[in-house]
C-alpha cells in the first residue's frame, strides 16, 4: 500500500508534514477498520506526547478530524483535506547554552552534556523529578536535543516518524494495542534513548575521587588505582598489573607480537597507542600544544616531558648519586654510568654505548654521513651539536664566560678546561710516570713519550712528531713563516709560546719559582731542569756506557766522546 510523505527530504526547519504519515482517499479506503483504528490511536498518542513535551502551540486540523471521527485522507494537491498548516515548527525552538546547562546539570550523571558524545547518561530518578515539575525550560531543551539529533543522524520523513512512535507497520497488518497511555516517565525515557541518550536507574560512585561508573565491576577495577592492588602478574618477569587488559598488552613485550600495522608504511606495533602516535609522522599532525611557548607535539607524553622545561620539575632521581632528571629515559641512561652497562654495540667495530642515540651518532663515523649543513659556509657535520658550535664562528657568540677572569668561550668544554688554570686541577694522570695534566689531550700527547709514537709527519722532510701542533710549528721552518712578532724589538717567532717567553727578556718576568731554593726562571722547562739538581733525577741515559745525565744537552755532549 502506498504512503506519501511531504516533503521527501529533511529541511532546515522540520514541520509536522515531515514526520506525519498521510494517505490519499484511495489509500484510506483500502484500510480495514482495525487498521484505521490503530492509525487514529497512534496519531493521537503521539500528539499527546508532543503536547506533554511542550512542543505544540496549536492543534493540527488532522488531530481535530481524528478526535471527531472524520476521515483524514489527502487531496490530490498533496495537502490533507481540511488540514490547518499553522503548526509551529517542531524544531524551531532554540535553547541557549546557559539554559541547556541549567537543565542538564540536574539530570546528567557525569560531566557536561554534549550532543556529540557517543554516550551521555541521564539518571532516571532525576529525570522523573524534572518531568513531574512540568518545567517549560526542560521541554524547550528536549526540543533542541531532537533538532540536533535529527541533523546529526540525517533521518528523513517516516524514519524520524518511527522514532517519535509513528508506527508505519500499521498499514501491513492490524495488531492489538493497549488502550492505556504510556506513563510520562516512560515517554521521556524512550525519547531520550531514541535520541542517543542513555538513561540509567543506578550508578556507582568512587568514594575516593568521585568518578562515576555504570557497572560495579568497572568501579572495582577503578578502585585498584587508589589501593595499588595488582592482581595480574606476568609469569615471565613477575611484573604485576591492576587490570587483565594491561597484562595482555605487556605480554607482547615477551612474545614480540605486533598486531597493529601502519597502512602507510607497513610498520608494526605492539600497542594501538604506539600506532596512533606513529601515524602522525605520516599525517604531520601535532595535536598537543604547549600553553607556555606554543610548541606542538605528536604525543601527550612528549608534551608532558617538554612542560618540565618550563616548570623545572625533575621527578626522576638517581638512588646512587641523587642526581635528578626530567625524563625517565634520561635516568635509565644515567644509571648505566654507575653500572657500567653499555647495551648498544656497533656491529662494525664492536664499540659499545650506553644509549641508542649515541650508537646512531657513532655509526656516522663508518658511513661518513654528515647530515648537518652550515648555511653560511657550506661545511657539513656528523652531529647537530657540532654544527651549533661551528655556527658561533660566524656569529661570534661566546655564551660560556669564566666567573674568575671574565674570559668567554664558544664551548662549555673549553670553559671547563680553562677553569682548571684557576683551580690548578689536573684530573688526567699518566699511568707510567704519574705525571698529571689539566687536559686529556695533553695526557694523550704525553703518552707518546713512553710509547715513542709519532703519528704526525712533515710532508717536506719526513720528520715525525707526537702532536699535531708540533708538526704545524715545524712546517714554519720550511715556509719561513714567523707570524708572532715582538713589539719591543721586532723579532719574529714561528710559535706564540716562543714569543711569550721572549717578551720576558724585556719585562724581566720570571714566573716559575723553585719551591726548594726560591730561584726563579722565565720558562717552565728551565725550572724542571733545575729541579733535578735537588731531586738527583737523571732521565737521560747513554746507550753505550749507561751513564745518566740530568739534561739532554749534557747527554748530547757526552755521546760525542764515543764517536
UniProtKB/Swiss-Prot annotation:
**Which SUPFAM superfamilies does the record match to this protein?**
beta-beta-alpha zinc fingers, KRAB domain (Kruppel-associated box)
Record-linked InterPro entries: KRAB (IPR001909), KRAB_dom_sf (IPR036051), Znf_C2H2_sf (IPR036236), Znf_C2H2_type (IPR013087)
Cite the residue ranges of zinc fingers (C2H2-type): 204-226, 232-254, 260-282, 288-310, 316-338, 344-366, 372-394, 400-422, 428-450, 456-478, 484-506, 512-534, 540-562
Q: Which Pfam families match?
A: KRAB, zf-C2H2, zf-H2C2_2
Single GO term (MF): RNA polymerase II cis-regulatory region sequence-specific DNA binding
Q: Name one GO cellular component term.
A: nucleus
Sorted UniProt keywords:
DNA-binding, Metal-binding, Nucleus, Repeat, Transcription, Transcription regulation, Zinc, Zinc-finger
Chief location of this protein within or outside the cell: nucleus
* Source organism, top-level taxon: Eukaryota
The KRAB domain, residue ranges: 14-85
> Which compartments is it annotated to reside in?
Nucleus
| Any one Gene Ontology BP term | regulation of transcription by RNA polymerase II
Give a short account of what the protein does: May be involved in transcriptional regulation.
What protein family is recorded? Belongs to the krueppel C2H2-type zinc-finger protein family.
What is the protein name given in its UniProt record? Zinc finger protein 879
